[in-house]
Amino acid sequence: MKKVPSDLEIAQAHEMIPIAEIAKNIGLGEDDIDLYGKYKAKISLDVLRKFNDRAMGKLIDITAITPTPLGEGKTVTTIGLCQGLGKIGKKVITTLRQPSMGPVFGIKGGAAGGGYSQVVPMEDINIHFTGDIHAVEAANNLLAAMIDTSILLGNPLNIDPMTVMWNRVLDTNDRALRDIVVGLGGKENGYPRQTSFDMAVASEVMAILALAENLHDLRQRLGRIIVAYTYDGKPVTAEDLKAAGAMTVIMKEALKPNLVQTLEGQACIMHAGPFANIAHGNNSVLADKIALNLADYVVTESGFGSDLGMEKFMDIKCRQSGLRPSCVVITCTIRALKMHGGLGNVVAGKPLPEELTRENLPALEKGCANLAHHIKVASYYGVPVVVSINRFTPDTDAEVDLVRKKALEAGALGAYPITVWAEGGEGAIELAEAVVAACEKTADFQLLYPDNLSIKEKIEVLATKVYNADGVVFEPLAERKIKQFEDLGLGHLPICMAKTHLSISHDPAMKGLPKNYIFPIRDIRASVGAGFLYPLAGAMRTMPGLGSKPAAHNVDIDEYGRTVGLF
């Protein structure tokens, strides 16, 4: 049997185009980019002013059904559709989040696609890239250090140490740092207090990077970060600590979007990487706006399912930026739909249960309730919906036909199998043609809720319409926080729900289409710099841990100095 090359082997065998040539192909000159070697570049923010008189392209958002822990190939679909649009002669750019090294060396892997649907240079993208995440880490941790210093040296801002909620961050999965004590060893080491580390991509600084419109906006947003409260209950901000200016300087280069390429030579603007289950889970506004000025079609991706990344794309990113999508593509796999129909227990790092590789039309039909709900959620926003079936070898024609039928019944314009992992853009031509047709339809874009609803009302809209709950229960802590935030004048902010990605509900064990349940809110927090409130539903970890067999075990260099084992 012929050996199937790994993602890394495919990427290493590929002859990349110099990034200056990729830039030229989309209309950028030497003065518009800063080279980071031969195959990576940063794009000057002056490009927005330079091309602001151009007609904007069509924005296509790729989302998904509720995934298994393995993921359903949303990034592969995003890149593959971009390549497919290129195959049919369209001027297209894809915009993606950049990966965090935590998942790269954990179980999930990187975020550069896979097979023949990848962006390159894959190794650089997955490890360090242009240093943006390190800048986020440095800016975040500078603020943390200034908080502890202020408390120790006279506490001029009257900060109550018990209210400090600004954690340090690290771009590594390290569970030992989830619950720690700092400031031990005497007064010269600081004021002892309990705290924790988060993943760098969980930092509000990362969310701010993704939502900032320009350098001035970045500076203002960083200044609005609430880090603690005084003994009198007043918020303390990064501006109060005189930290925001220095943080902005650290983040100045990171604000410039990164330019790389697909395996088939289309431009990819990869920038920012906030988590989708605890933040808003989308690439930067700047990346999308630059791409829309340079291409006729821009294919972007929202994290996890429509209940998380896509909802936040619409209700946070589009609300704040004025972006308007022309089409939504929902990615699904037959294996995941059968799992939602009651078959198998998919566990990250373990082989796929055998029953998910055999034809089972009754289980598939039952699981299609999950797909139908995601189509319904996307339809709330008045945008045409297309379904992409990421096809695997065991999938039968009968199964594909059933999914297509159910997608049409649920209101999608159509459902199209793709084979982009194996065939690149050639495997997405039918989908690409369908998406072009969908983009020609008139979208009647609308947000799910207006700004002037109360905090509770916004949460109730999300719970009943998106999470399919019968209602919401607010725990006492959440009730107190809601009153506090409304008293502070923050009630107008949109909601960024922190919940599991493995279920439409708050409970990862509730597969398919959960119903007849009450959605619980145990706490609510404010990311004022990013511009949203984030309620917590269920247990959420902001610092993952490594498993017994992390991906890091497989990564090494060979005798020629080449990376091996990176997927």
From Swiss-Prot:
A biological process from GO: tetrahydrofolate interconversion
The keyword Cytoplasm belongs to this UniProt entry's keyword annotation: no
Taxonomic source organism: Desulforamulus reducens (strain ATCC BAA-1160 / DSM 100696 / MI-1) (Desulfotomaculum reducens)
Listed name of the protein: Formate--tetrahydrofolate ligase
CDD domains assigned: FTHFS
HAMAP family (UniProt xref): FTHFS (MF_01543)
Keywords: ATP-binding, Ligase, Nucleotide-binding, One-carbon metabolism
Enzyme class: ligase
Residues involved in ATP binding: 68-75
Disulphide-bonded residues: none
Highest taxon of source: Bacteria
GO molecular function, one term: ATP binding
Pfam families referenced in this protein's UniProt entry, alphabetically: FTHFS
Reactions catalysed: (6S)-5,6,7,8-tetrahydrofolate + formate + ATP = (6R)-10-formyltetrahydrofolate + ADP + phosphate
E.C. numbers: 6.3.4.3
NCBIfam families associated with the record: PRK13505.1
